[in-house]
Curated annotation (Swiss-Prot):
Reactions accelerated catalytically: dUTP + H2O = dUMP + diphosphate + H(+)
Organism: Histophilus somni (strain 2336)
Keywords (A to Z) from UniProt: Hydrolase, Magnesium, Metal-binding, Nucleotide metabolism
Enzyme class: hydrolase
Pfam family, one: dUTPase
Name assigned to this protein: Deoxyuridine 5'-triphosphate nucleotidohydrolase
InterPro entries: dUTPase, dUTPase-like, dUTPase-like_sf, dUTPase_trimeric
Keyword Magnesium: yes
One Gene Ontology term of the molecular function aspect: dUTP diphosphatase activity
Alphabetized Gene3D superfamilies for the sequence: 2.70.40.10
Amino acid sequence: MKKIDVKILDPRIGTEFPLPTYATIGSAGLDLRALVDEGFEVQPGETKLISTGLSIYIADPNLAAVILPRSGLGHKNGIVLGNLVGLIDSDYQGPLMVSLWNRSDKPFKIEIGDRIAQLVFVPVVQAEFNIVEEFQQTDRGNGGFGHSGKK
């Protein structure tokens, strides 16, 4: 398992709330919590930026992290990420924040310590552009959205 440096920005982590861990041996994501001063409601159509109480420094340029929504919040309550996916570069060292968007028609209550998103580490390959005049022909060519049909 890869070691990632973490700074605990909220003293409740490690006492009232655990450091994020994998729930099962097959888990890909670490749950991030709302480390706020008090509970609040996210109104329909509203977006809130929420502290997780952590910052990380990945350091390895072959890794990045993504903040993703928790499936239950989106499917059952209409709570998704305001930026859809948060990308954490390997050289970022600031606080991990979660942008939550209530796309439902009902207010949604966030309590202190609620699990609101998940952090997943992913491999990164940096690429350099090679300028060409033409591409080698493929079967797909420039077929884009819906090119392969529905069935």
